[in-house]
Amino acid sequence: MNQEEKIRQIDQTVIDYYSKKAVSDSLVESILYSVQAGGKRIRPLLLLELVEAFGLPLQSAHFQVASALEMIHTGSLIHDDLPAMDDDDYRRGRLTNHKKFGEAMAILAGDSLFLDPYGLIAVAELPSRVKVNLIMELSQAAGTFGMVGGQALDMEGEGCQLDLKELQTIHAHKTGKLLAFPFVAAGLLVQVDKGVQAKLRQIGELIGLAFQVRDDILDVTASFEELGKTPQKDLVAAKSTYPALLGLEKAKETLDQVLDQAQNLLKEIAKNRPFSGESLTKIIESLRLYD
């Protein structure tokens, strides 16, 4: 199954989940508007590619876990775009959810996409112990101790001059935890040993850092057409960013160094057990920026 086919099945898994009789058709319309807005689906693809790299054939349960992750990510984008947060009118090249459906419905759509994923994982045909651990890890990655906590720190840091350590703490939680989840989840699904699981978590944290450095660079250098959203929002909000603290060229060097570290750890995993990570490597390499 190629990546385009995987993306189609990820999307279909979410659509199927909401195809049963809903309490509010308007709510489902708002949810699916954002779910079907496109995007690279990097988080769920990383999870699926990892499962395959360890030699496990993909099953419906794996797509349910991957789709649950994408649902939470999409919910976070809906809330990020709200006037009380980033106040953005466009996401992925079209109107943000609150501009299309109103703020109240957008909030509810985001709420649903934060809560429903746990139900999707719960009904997956997986061992109960694995499902409990997946739900626990996703809760830690998405909630108070992960993405939401990082967003709170990010808001508190607006207009303040943060140092590099403070910035890394914010993004390790705001962006990093949810990007580390595919690696942790794959380890749980494949049931690797503790040593490999620790390496997978470390790789995920590095990818999370790389993703944020990349996002900060693009906010400075990319156009609306390239981003699909308003550029230079961080500058307007007076946020500390990697280019602001390190300079643009040093930020680019940091991005490459972090991605190199992640690739080296993948090679270490491949030395000690069957592991075919070519597709995974391509996804990671796609995060590099070239002049």
Regions found by a protein language model. Give the residues of each.
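All-alpha prenyltransferase/terpene-synthase fold signal
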Residues: 1-291
